[in-house]
A protein has these predicted regions:
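Short regulatory alpha-helical segment in sensory/regulatory domains of signaling proteins that mediates
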Residues: 11-12, 105
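Structured binding elements
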Residues: 136
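Anion (oxyanion) recognition and catalysis
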Residues: 133
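Conserved AMP-binding/adenylate-forming core of the ANL superfamily
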Residues: 58, 75-129
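Adenylate-forming
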Residues: 4-10
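Acyl-group handling in specialized metabolite and lipid biosynthesis
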Residues: 43-54, 80-88
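A short N-terminal helical cap/helix-turn-helix that marks the beginning
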Residues: 12-34, 53-76
């Protein structure tokens, strides 16, 4: 609880420093193509976080992780009703996402297009969501 109180106080007293330090500590887990110039900027009514920085959520979820964790489980699926339990490694998930992304592109879906997925909770559903993010579909 003491650590929480210290972090809360730091965030309250100097939020820009707090978020900058937190982001710097997360550099091993979040790849930035370009580092930010400003942590936070508020020009009412607009505000920006990590202004000038460039990262990519799809890249961070798989491309960056597969380099370090290729054979580690990326997703573990459990369905007690069907008595199913299986997992997929980062390498396997990366391959599946690339196949789904290719299929989406082949169907004419491009950056900015809206995609509706109606799938059961599964590894394939997660892979399809990541594939949409990978090609920039919404």
């Amino acid at each position: 609880m003491q650590i929480f109180k210290e972090l809360w106080k730091m965030e309250k007293d100097d939020p820009k420093r707090f978020w900058n330090e937190l982001a710097m500590k997360a550099m091993d887990d979040i790849y930035w193509f370009k580092a930010w110039e400003k942590v936070f900027e508020w020009d009412y009514p607009r505000f920006s976080w990590f202004k000038g920085g460039k990262t990519n959520i799809a890249y961070n979820c798989l491309d960056y992780k597969v380099k370090r964790f290729a054979s580690k489980p990326a997703y573990i699926y459990e369905n007690p009703e069907l008595d199913l339990s299986y997992s997929i490694t980062y390498s396997q998930l990366f391959s599946l996402v690339k196949k789904f992304a290719s299929a989406l592109r082949g169907s004419g879906i491009k950056r900015g297009d809206r995609v509706l997925l109606y799938l059961p909770n599964s590894i394939e559903a997660a892979a399809m969501i990541l594939a949409c993010a990978r090609i920039g579909a919404i």
